[in-house]
Each structure stands twice: as structure tokens, then as C-alpha cells.
């Protein structure tokens, strides 16, 4: 295959982004954005949030104030590494301490006098414990000197039970674009949120709604619950911007379709009529009257001037330091979009579009919780001071209130999966797939309550805005999370920015904008508004917009602003806006730059020769105009060519229409999809199913499983895949392995391997083929007195325990064995008993079907004895275990065949696995055949011409034709054996061999597809799911077997099982299982008159309904199931009467059977 040609330049540039970039501080690209997000929080943002100085209470017109000051914030890393934390069974936390001072300020003639009320210097080792994110090589952001373990990528937290936790990224509820909604015909709303910049703490949120009803245009109002007045949007814009209504009319009508202009005129005319209806109308007086009315309505304690100042100053918090005039122009630009959206809704980004949303990363979770809990902490201090002053007359604070900030509980809840009372953010790391370390932190999902609303079911669809930024294959295909969790593509990441960087960047951009001629950036009537994070800063001359955007993008790429991830979006289509985004939580990815119809990659001749020695940051620095980091909003409003090949086939005029060009198709997949092979050669559903199965594959975990008491399934003899993609290699998924190479044959075997059944060779299993070891944690808590009690009668369950009451190391546990002594004793109140002490065993037993060896035992002594046992078990493939290829050809072991039963080739080689050949045709997985062909070709030429081992690159999605791969295989075979004939060469290339029948030693009539492939073992193991039970516990309500193997549960016998038995005519079995089984039998008496169930009063059965009517009905005894009685009782409790009626049948008479003569025939 050709290498480093011009046609592959885009592919090579894409690969540069995936590999580590130490010059830019990128050591592991897939999770780098998570590391930066958390590092920003714990190194910078936490100090900003906790460092506080503000008034708690004020008296006597602010001449006396109770102040709180939090300072000396210090964060200390743990003394040990994550491995030591796991061995000790402890969490891996950083300690945060601070000093709290509460004092009283009194304003006097001499100045301000300060009186100390309370002080607390937080040195408590449990004040605030912040879970530390473990990064690449076991690093943490507080102590970068920790040793590196190259295969440990981290991305996990360790909680107090030493359980590893990983989280997904949630889509933020607040949208950056206003949400348009049709309330009813001709009635619309436009809702938007305003959030203060990151440098303003505490963060202020305001939510506004603009309403418009065509039948009542005078009521086109803007409102906000308890934070703003309800006022006509046009008059508010006029009040803030200090312009005339005609100015607003011209601004709204500029570059609008005729139908929108008509609506604009109607709205302005309605506002005029509103002003004319008021005598001597004055806009200031009108607004002041509304503010006074709101002041009275809210019964505010503030003066009217303070109330008005607070309301107008806090209006639009995201434009906190912006003059009112710019706020007015911003409202006019919002109204433009609103009116246009009424007629052209499809052209406006809808609420499900990722353009409108930011993403919450790990650091943002902790930042939000720290901010909320700090406000609760300060509120508790304020309430405590007020209560003490009210009850005792002193300003004092209880020390308990000062020492309980509440952050520990919030962080603990976060790692339990609850972020702000919403489930789904964090989960326990599954210890069977190393790949989950990458896939879970790179997945993006929605709040659960965001999807409970029926109107938001459309959020489950693959939205057009997700194209290129999200993997279209790796989405859940079943269950409640269908379509809700998406994987980022390999080139996508999420932006992070420090507060200081944010302010510097905002300042530089504003200086650049103001460097233009003043009149050109003051086109507020007919210009294009320029916003930075939705805050209006200027309005540009329409004739300059293209030059401005082009120049801005060039300066951005050259590092003029000091940030390469700034997003600039030119919104045309009559909405007319230039949006500059610099905040955190934006989705970004690189694109190839097209400038004036030229692909900039092609106009840099030095790039190709120097590319091998450069990192991605070097390319951005030395060839800045080749690649641009583009956020999802800029991408949506830009013209992007799908591939370099298509771009080069266009004419010059067509090329000039494009701004960007995409990388090859393999970079649109996520890291899980990249572990598959050639999904574009298969049917569509195979990609989705393949991603789900790849995440279930058992891999080789890098953590020290013998020193960690934790659950896990681990591949014992893993092999690195031969056929890989670049993403699989750079993410270290390939190096950490998730399968083995096996020899397969596609054929039928005695009719055993039908459907998903596979045949596996016995000797292959005995040699350790796809062998795994299961590590399992067993944890019990025992009362101290029970643990110290001695058993009176020797129990078989305690045969594996030592004299100290704990299970022996290296003991083999079987089902029913106890893991620690737990004997409960009780004293009988019987004076005649010789020994009134009785004891009985209440220990938890080992419940697995297979024997396990005890590897480690840990004991903690508190008020209870906590025993943790780690067991290990080697588990070879057995019947029913599941396996799969990387093309979603899942199979279940149907038969384990001896080598002598299997067909063999001319060299005596037998296949390790036999797969049903019809599965290729039914599932259309052509790439599975290609993988076998490429793996076989590698086996004859595993080294390149330089003598280096080279895996075969077969990306998950690629534009390479199958003929190219066949040609590559042909070259490999011709190089190793140039004397092959055409037929022999064809058989080698297409892996076709003549196999011999093991019973007759004669060749089969047709050739068989026979070759090596990378095979995966899935976590679905027979012995983990199989359950055997004859009798046991039942549920109280329905009296069926309880659920769960661990609880000794069984199979619930329901309607489907009943129907199966009915189909077989097993009437007696049905009666026995459903009615006559133990306590399920129920005798009831039925009143033949009214059909009620008779009640039992003083051991006498009577019908309550008939007895009140002085009737004497006949009671008939019937036997029924307990479930039927429960059903009737519940229906009666809900006011529904179910009448039990008896079927009246005439008696049936059968004729006598014919007599049978049993005499022998010769006696007759």
C-alpha cells in the first residue's frame, strides 16, 4: 500500500492531532480536555469560588454590617498514589482548607470600626475532601511528580469504598440561542437565559420570555418572574437604547422578507397606539410607574430607588458592565430573530440543536457544586447569626455551623451518580473492558428530566448539528438511553478556559474590534451586531462583514488573540449577526482551511517534507493557515466540503464557496467505533451493534488486580490486534489488547453451528485460548458480638474458616461456604432448660456456581467488623459463553469439539473456531472477510522493507476500495513466494483452502474460507447467569419466586410460561405450579347471590352485602390462587366490583366403556 503520498496528506494531518503533543502539554489526547477541565477547577477556580468577602446582614441604613471573609484557601494533595489508595481501600482525595472570619463593621465619624465576632482556621483533615481525578500515568493536577505508568490512562475517581468512578458529560440545560415555541396558532414565545460572566461571583442567572400574540400585538411583552417588570418589548428597547420608534422600525425591517416587514410595521404601530393612549406619554415615566407597581406587588423591603437600581442593573447579567444603550440594541437584535423565526422556523437552530448547548465536563460539575454549597454554607451562617441574635441578643455563630461546609456530601453524591438531584452523571467503572475508560468520559448525554417531557422525544434522533462532531455509530440501540448518549468523534474535544484567560481574551477581541473606524462599528440601525458570548459590543457595516470575518479567522490562527479555539460565526439568512464564542463547554475539532478557493494544505510545499518531525502544535505555529479549530456553531453556519477528493474535483468558482474542508471518514468515528474494522463495507446496523459488543469485550486491565479488592474480568493471554486503525493505536486500546487471534473456518459442522452457534476446539481451550480470570469482591458487615461468638455445633459452612473467624488464604470456596464467622445468640426464658442459650448461623454464604480461590482478605474494626474478600477464578470457555468478531458476528459456544473431530488442511492444521458461513450473507459483514485476508497477508510478511514490524491499517470507516486491499495481500504473498501459480496465489489471497473430512480423510468437494481473525470474548458468561433452584424464598405480595441469583431467587412463573404449558396440554402441571404449590393454595367462599367473597367474622363465613339486606344466600367453597384474591381485593379498594359468577351447566353423561377381553386368542 502506498504511504505518505499527496492524496494522504489530509489523513496524515489528522493523525498528528491524535498522537501525544508534549510541547502543548498533551500526553493523552482522548481525555486531555477532561484533565484540563478538572485541573482548572482544582488549581484556579476553587480558589476563586471560596475566596469571599461580602456582607451577611446590614442594619441602620447600612451603617452597621455583619461581614464574612473566607481566605487562605489551600489545597493539599494526598501523600500516597492511587495504587496505595486502592490497596488500603481508601479514597483518593485532596484536602481543601480555608480560614473564616466573621466581624462587625460600624460606620462612625472617625471611620469604620471593626469588631471580631467569630473566627475559624480550618485545619481539620476532613473539612473539604475533594475527589482527585487520576490522569494519564497516575498523575494528578496537584502533584505532577508522581511516577508514570504508561498504560494507565486514568480518567477515573476513587471513592471512599475504593471503587473507581467515571462520568459522562451532560448537556447543559441553559441554551445559548433563545428557544422559539409555538404556544398556539398565532401565539409565540421566545425564551432566553442570561448568565453572568465567570469573573462575577456568585453567578447570577436570569430567565426572560418574550411573548407575542398576533391578535394582541400591544401585549408583545418581555417578562421574568420576580426579577423584572412585564413591559412592551418595543418600548423597553426604546427606553434602553434612547432611539425613536422609527429607528427601531428601520432596524427590524432591514434585509427582511416582505412578510416579516409587514409584521414589523404592525408591531411598531401597536406600540405607537399604546403610547398615544396615554396622556402626555413619557417613556421614563412609563417605566418608572411599572417599576413602582412591581415594587408594591413584591412587597420589597428596599426603597424604590434601590429596587429600581437592582432591577435594571441586574437586567441581562451577561452584559453586566455594558451601557444600557447597548442592552437596548441587543433587545432589538433578539426581536429581529424572533420575528424572522415566526415565518422561517426551520432555518433557526431548534432547542435540540447542539449549536444551542454547552457541555458540562468534570471540572464544571465540581465548580457548580462548590458554588452552590458555598452559598448554602454562607446562608447557614447568616441564619445562625440571626437566630442567636433573636434568642440571646448576641451576634455569634455555633462552631458546628462553621465546620460543616457541606461540600463533602455534595461531592459524594456526585460520584454516586447524582448531580444536582439528577441521576446519570457518574457510574461505577465496569472492570471488564479497558475501553470503557475512554468511551464513558468522552460520551455526552442529557439530563434525565430533559427527556421525560414528551415533547422532547425528538432529542433521541441523530440531530444534523451532531454530524462530524459525534460518532453516528456508537449510540445505545436499546433500553431507556436509546439515542440519548452519544460518543464524541476522535477529533472532537470540549473547550476549557481559565477566568484570567477569559478576561484577557475578551479584552484583546474588543481592542481588535475597536481598532476599526468608529463609524464602521456603529451601524446599529442596519448593521451586523457583533456579540462576544452573546454580549453586544458593536454593530458592523454590512459591506465589511466578509473582510472582518476573514481577517479575524486569519489572526486567530496566527495566535494574535492567544487562543486558537475562539469561534467566530457569521449568521446570514436575514438574521444578520456575527457571534464570537470564547467560553468553556463548546465542542471543537480541527478542519482543513479553504481560503479564496484554495486548500491551504496544497499551497505549503514544505509541509509534506517536514510533517514527520512535527507535532500538531508545531503545525499550528509554523503553518497556521493549514488547520483551524472550529466550534460546532461556526461549523453549522459555514460551508464545509465533505472531503479533499471531492474538493479537488470541483471548478474554481465552486471551490470559492467553501470555507473549510473535512478530514477523511475515519475521523468521524469515535474511539469505540475505531476499534471495529471497515464498517462502511457492512450493513448499517452492524456498526451500532458492533460498538455495543466491543464495549462488552473482556480486555487486559492495567490496574493491579491482585492488590485491589474490586470486581473485574481480565483476559489472561491477550494479543495486540494486527489489523488496526490509527485511533486504536494512539488511544492505547490496541496496546492494552481486548482479544486474541484465532483460526476460523466458515462452514457448516454437522448441523450443530446453526444461527449463532459456533464450534470451538477443545485443545485450543486447554492451551489457554481466550482464557479469563475473574476477580470478585465479597464484602460483609458483622456485628462485633456475633463475630466473637463461638459456634456450638460444627457447621460445614465454616470448614474454610480459620480460628480467627476469617476465611483462609488460598482456600477454594464453594457454594454455601461462609466467608466470616457470624453467629447470633439468644437467651431462652425457660427456667427448666439446662442450657437456655441458643445460637444459629446467620453468615452470608458464597453463592457462585463455580469454585474460587481466596486471594486477599481485609478486615476493618469499628462498631462492626467489615470483612472484604477477594476471590480469583480462572474460567475457560464453556457451552453458552459468547464471543464476537469486530464486525458484530456474535456467536455462542454450541459444541466443544476434540481436535480429532475437526476438519484439517494439507498441513494438519485444524480451525480453532468454526462459524456458520451463512452468517456472512445474512448480516452482510464483508469487512470480516477482508480482516481475515489482511491478517493472513500479515502473517507471511509481518515486517516492512526497513525490517520494522508494521500492523495493517484498516480504519473503521474508509474510502479505500476492496481491490486495494486485495492488491496489498497479493504483493505480500508474491514477496514471500514469487513462484506461486495464479490459482495458488488466488487461493492464498482469498484464504480458500481444501479441508479434509476427519472421519473419511477425504477432501471436501468445495474449498473452505480458512484464516486468522481477531476474536473477542464477551462478558456474558454462562455461569454468571445460570441459576438452579428447587424451592426457596417467595415474595409476600404475589408469592412467586423472588428475583436475583445472589438472593437465591428463581424464575417467576407468569402468563407466558402458563401459555407454553397450555400449548403442551399440561393441565395438571399448570394446576400444580399455579395453584397447588405450597402456600399459594387459597380457600375462599363465594356468595352465589351477589358474587362477593365472604368475610369471616368470629370463625363464621358470611356475605356482608346480603346480610345487610336480610338475605340468606348460599355460600360455595372454591379453591383459587392467592394472586387472584390479591387482585380482587385491590380492585375492590379502587371502587371496582368484580363479580364471581358460577357457570350453570347441565350434567353430562357418558356411555359406559366397552369391555375389553384379556383372554389369549387361542382360548377364545
UniProtKB/Swiss-Prot annotation:
Q: Does the keyword NAD apply?
A: no
Q: Does the keyword Transcription apply?
A: yes
Q: Which Pfam families match?
A: RNA_pol_Rpb2_3 (PF04565), RNA_pol_Rpb2_5 (PF04567), RNA_pol_Rpb2_6 (PF00562), RNA_pol_Rpb2_7 (PF04560), rpo132 (PF12415)
Alphabetical GO CC annotations of the entry are:
DNA-directed RNA polymerase complex; virion component
Q: Which InterPro entries match?
A: DNA-dir_RNA_pol_su2, DNA-dir_RNAP_su2_dom, DNA-dir_RNAP_su2_hyb_sf, RNA_pol_132_poxvirus, RNA_pol_bsu_CS, RNA_pol_Rpb2_3, RNA_pol_Rpb2_5, RNA_pol_Rpb2_7
Its keywords, alphabetically, are: DNA-directed RNA polymerase, Metal-binding, Nucleotidyltransferase, Transcription, Transferase, Virion
What is the reaction catalyzed? RNA(n) + a ribonucleoside 5'-triphosphate = RNA(n+1) + diphosphate
Q: Which Gene3D superfamilies match?
A: 2.40.50.150, 3.90.1100.10, DNA-directed RNA polymerase, subunit 2, domain 6, RNA polymerase alpha subunit dimerisation domain
One biological-process term from Gene Ontology?
A: DNA-templated transcription
Where does the UniProt annotation locate this protein? Virion
As recorded in UniProt, its EC number(s) are: 2.7.7.6
Q: Which domain of life does the UniProt lineage start with?
A: Viruses
Primary location group: virion
Listed as disulfide-bonded, the cysteine pairs are: none
Any one GO molecular-function label of the UniProt entry: DNA-directed RNA polymerase activity
> What PROSITE patterns does the entry give?
RNA_POL_BETA
Concerning its family, UniProt says: Belongs to the RNA polymerase beta chain family.
State the protein's purpose: Part of the DNA-dependent RNA polymerase which catalyzes the transcription of viral DNA into RNA using the four ribonucleoside triphosphates as substrates. Responsible for the transcription of early, intermediate and late genes. DNA-dependent RNA polymerase associates with the early transcription factor (ETF), itself composed of D6 and A7, thereby allowing the early genes transcription. Late transcription, and probably also intermediate transcription, require newly synthesized RNA polymerase.
Summarize the subunit comment: The DNA-dependent RNA polymerase used for intermediate and late genes expression consists of eight subunits (147) kDa, (133) kDa, (35) kDa, (30) kDa, (22) kDa, (19) kDa, (18) kDa and (7) kDa totalling more than 500 kDa in mass. The same holoenzyme, with the addition of the transcription-specificity factor RAP94, is used for early gene expression.
Protein name as annotated: DNA-directed RNA polymerase 132 kDa polypeptide
Tell me which species this is from: Camelpox virus (strain CMS)
Amino acid at each position: 500500500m502506498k504511504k505518505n503520498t499527496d492524496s494522504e496528506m489530509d489523513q496524515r494531518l489528522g493523525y498528528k492531532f491524535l498522537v501525544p503533543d508534549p510541547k502543548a502539554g498533551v500526553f493523552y489526547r482522548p481525555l486531555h480536555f477532561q484533565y484540563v477541565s478538572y485541573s482548572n477547577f482544582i488549581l484556579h477556580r476553587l480558589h476563586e469560588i471560596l475566596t469571599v468577602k461580602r456582607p451577611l446582614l446590614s442594619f441602620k441604613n447600612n451603617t452597621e454590617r455583619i461581614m464574612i471573609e473566607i481566605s487562605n484557601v489551600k489545597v493539599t494533595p494526598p501523600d500516597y498514589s492511587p495504587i496505595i489508595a486502592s490497596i488500603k481501600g481508601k479514597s483518593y482525595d485532596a484536602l481543601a482548607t480555608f480560614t473564616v472570619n466573621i466581624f462587625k463593621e460600624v460606620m462612625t465619624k472617625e471611620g469604620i470600626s471593626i469588631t471580631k465576632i467569630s473566627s475559624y482556621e480550618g485545619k481539620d483533615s476532613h473539612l473539604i475532601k475533594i475527589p482527585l481525578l487520576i490522569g494519564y500515568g497516575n498523575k494528578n493536577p496537584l502533584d505532577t511528580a508522581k511516577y508514570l505508568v504508561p498504560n494507565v490512562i486514568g480518567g477515573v475517581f476513587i471513592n471512599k469504598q475504593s471503587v473507581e468512578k467515571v462520568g459522562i458529560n451532560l448537556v447543559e440545560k441553559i441554551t445559548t440561542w433563545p428557544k422559539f415555541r409555538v404556544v398556539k396558532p398565532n401565539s409565540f414565545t421566545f425564551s432566553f437565559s442570561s448568565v453572568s460572566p465567570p469573573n462575577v461571583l456568585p453567578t447570577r442567572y436570569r430567565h426572560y420570555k418574550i411573548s407575542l400574540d398576533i391578535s394582541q400585538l400591544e401585549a408583545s411583552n418581555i417578562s421574568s418572574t420576580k426579577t423584572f417588570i412585564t413591559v412592551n418589548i418595543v418600548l423597553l428597547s426604546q427606553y434602553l437604547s434612547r432611539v425613536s420608534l422609527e429607528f427601531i422600525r428601520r432596524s427590524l425591517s432591514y434585509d427582511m422578507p416582505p412578510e416579516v416587514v409587514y409584521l414589523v410595521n404592525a408591531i411598531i404601530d401597536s406600540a405607537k397606539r399604546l403610547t398615544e393612549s396615554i396622556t402626555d406619554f413619557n417613556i421614563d415615566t412609563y417605566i418608572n410607574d411599572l417599576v413602582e407597581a412591581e415594587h408594591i406587588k413584591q412587597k420589597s423591603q428596599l426603597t424604590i430607588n434601590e429596587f429600581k437600581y437592582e432591577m435594571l442593573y441586574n437586567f441581562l447579567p451577561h452584559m453586566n458592565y455594558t451601557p444600557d444603550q447597548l442592552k437596548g440594541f441587543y433587545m432589538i437584535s433578539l426581536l429581529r430573530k424572533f420575528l424572522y423565526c415566526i415565518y422561517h422556523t426551520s432555518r433557526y437552530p431548534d432547542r435540540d440543536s447542539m449549536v444551542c448547548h454547552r457541555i458540562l465536563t468534570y471540572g464544571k460539575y465540581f465548580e457548580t457544586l462548590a458554588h452552590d454549597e458555598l452559598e448554602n454554607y454562607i446562608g447557614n451562617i447568616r441564619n445562625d447569626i440571626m437566630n442567636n441574635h433573636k434568642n440571646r441578643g448576641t451576634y455569634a455563630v455555633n462552631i458546628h455551623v462553621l465546620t460543616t461546609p457541606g461540600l463533602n456530601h455534595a461531592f459524594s453524591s456526585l460520584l454516586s451518580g447524582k448531580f444536582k438531584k439528577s441521576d446519570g452523571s457518574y457510574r461505577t467503572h465496569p472492570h471488564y473492558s479497558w475501553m470503557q475508560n475512554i468511551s464513558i468520559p468522552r460520551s455526552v448525554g442529557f439530563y434525565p428530566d430533559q427527556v421525560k417531557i414528551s415533547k422532547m422525544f425528538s432529542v433521541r434522533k441523530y440531530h444534523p448539528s451532531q454530524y462530524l462532531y459525534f460518532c453516528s455509530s456508537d449510540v445505545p440501540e436499546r433500553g431507556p438511553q436509546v439515542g440519548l448518549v452519544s460518543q464524541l468523534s476522535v477529533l472532537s474535544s470540549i473547550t476549557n478556559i481559565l477566568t484570567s484567560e477569559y478576561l484577557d481574551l475578551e479584552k484583546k477581541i474588543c481592542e481588535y474590534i475597536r481598532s476599526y473606524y468608529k463609524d464602521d462599528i456603529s451601524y446599529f440601525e442596519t448593521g451586523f451586531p457583533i456579540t462576544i458570548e452573546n454580549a453586544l459590543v458593536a454593530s458592523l457595516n454590512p459591506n465589511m462583514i466578509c473582510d472582518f470575518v476573514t481577517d479575524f479567522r486569519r489572526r486567530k490562527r496566527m495566535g494574535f488573540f492567544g487562543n486558537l479555539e475562539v469561534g467566530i460565526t457569521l449568521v446570514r439568512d436575514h438574521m444578520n449577526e456575527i457571534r464570537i464564542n470564547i467560553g468553556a463547554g463548546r465542542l471543537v475539532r480541527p478542519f482543513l482551511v479553504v481560503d479564496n478557493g484554495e486548500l491551504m494544505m496544497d499551497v505549503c510545499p514544505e509541509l509534506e517534507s517536514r510533517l514527520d518531525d512535527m507535532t500538531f502544535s508545531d503545525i499550528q505555529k509554523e503553518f497556521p493557515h493549514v488547520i483551524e479549530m472550529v466550534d460546532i456553531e461556526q461549523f453549522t453556519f459555514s460551508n464545509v466540503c465533505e472531503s479533499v477528493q471531492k474538493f479537488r474535483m470541483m471548478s474554481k468558482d465552486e471551490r470559492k464557496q467553501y470555507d473549510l474542508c473535512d478530514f477523511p471518514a475515519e475521523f468521524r468515528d469515535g474511539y469505540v467505533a475505531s476499534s471495529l474494522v471497515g464498517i462502511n463495507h457492512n450493513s448499517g446496523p452492524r456498526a451500532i451493534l458492533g460498538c455495543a459488543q466491543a464495549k462488552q469485550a473482556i480486555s487486559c486491565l492495567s490496574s493491579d488486580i491482585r492488590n485491589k479488592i474490586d470486581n473485574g474480568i481480565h483476559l489472561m493471554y491477550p494479543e495486540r490486534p494486527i489489523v488496526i486503525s490509527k485511533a486504536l493505536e494512539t488511544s492505547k486500546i490496541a496496546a492494552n489488547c481486548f482479544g486474541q487471534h484465532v483460526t476460523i473456518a466458515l462452514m457448516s459442522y454437522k448441523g450443530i453451528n446453526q444461527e449463532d452457534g459456533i464450534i470451538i476446539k477443545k485443545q485450543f481451550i486447554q492451551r489457554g485460548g481466550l482464557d479469563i480470570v475473574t476477580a470478585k469482591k465479597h464484602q460483609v458487615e458483622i456485628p462485633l458480638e456475633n463475630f466473637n461468638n463461638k459456634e456450638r455445633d460444627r457447621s460445614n459452612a465454616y470448614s474454610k474458616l480459620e480460628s480467627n473467624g476469617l476465611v483462609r488464604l488460598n482456600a477454594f470456596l464453594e457454594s454455601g461456604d461462609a466467608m466470616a464467622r457470624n453467629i447470633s445468640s439468644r437467651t431462652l426464658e425457660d427456667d427448666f432448660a439446662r442450657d437456655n442459650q441458643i445460637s444459629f448461623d446467620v453468615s452470608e454464604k458464597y453463592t457462585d456456581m463455580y469454585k474460587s480461590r481466596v486471594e486477599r482478605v481485609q478486615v476493618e474494626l469499628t462498631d462492626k467488623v467489615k470483612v472484604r474478600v477477594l476471590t480469583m477464578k480462572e474460567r475457560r470457555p464453556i457451552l453458552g459463553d459468547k464471543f464476537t468478531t469486530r464486525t458484530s458476528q456474535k456467536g455462542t459456544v454450541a459444541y466443544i469439539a476434540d481436535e480429532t473431530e475437526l476438519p484439517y488442511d494439507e498441513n494438519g492444521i485444524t480451525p480453532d473456531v468454526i462459524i456458520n458461513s451463512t452468517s456472512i450473507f445474512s448480516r452482510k459483514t464483508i469487512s470480516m472477510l477482508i480482516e481475515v485476508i489482511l491478517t493472513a497477508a500479515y502473517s507471511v510478511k509481518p515486517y516492512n522493507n526497513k525490517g520494522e514490524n508494521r500492523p495493517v491499517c484498516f480504519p473503521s470507516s474508509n474510502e479505500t476500495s476492496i481491490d486495494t486491499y486485495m492488491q496489498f495481500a497479493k504483493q505480500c504473498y508474491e514477496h514471500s513466494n514469487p513462484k506461486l501459480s495464479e490459482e495458488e496465489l488466488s487461493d492464498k489471497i482469498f484464504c480458500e483452502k481444501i479441508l479434509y473430512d476427519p472421519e473419511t480423510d477425504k477432501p471436501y468437494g468445495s474449498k473452505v474460507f480458512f484464516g486468522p481473525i481477531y476474536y473477542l470474548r464477551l462478558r456474558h458468561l454462562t455461569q454468571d447467569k445460570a441459576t438452579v433452584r428447587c424451592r426457596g424464598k417467595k415474595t409476600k405480595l404475589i408469592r412467586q419466586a423472588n428475583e436475583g441469583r445472589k438472593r437465591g431467587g428463581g424464575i417467576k412463573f407468569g402468563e407466558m410460561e402458563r401459555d407454553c404449558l397450555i400449548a403442551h396440554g399440561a393441565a395438571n402441571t399448570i394446576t400444580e405450579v399455579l395453584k397447588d404449590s405450597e402456600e399459594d393454595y387459597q380457600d375462599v367462599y363465594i356468595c352465589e347471590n351477589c358474587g362477593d367473597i365472604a368475610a369471616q367474622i368470629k370463625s363464621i363465613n358470611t356475605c356482608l352485602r346480603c346480610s345487610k339486606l336480610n338475605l340468606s344466600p348460599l355460600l360455595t367453597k372454591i379453591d383459587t390462587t392467592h394472586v387472584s384474591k390479591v387482585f380482587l381485593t385491590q380492585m375492590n379498594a379502587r371502587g371496582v366490583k368484580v363479580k364471581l359468577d358460577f357457570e350453570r351447566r347441565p350434567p353430562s353423561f357418558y356411555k359406559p366403556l366397552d369391555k375389553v377381553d384379556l383372554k389369549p386368542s387361542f382360548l377364545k
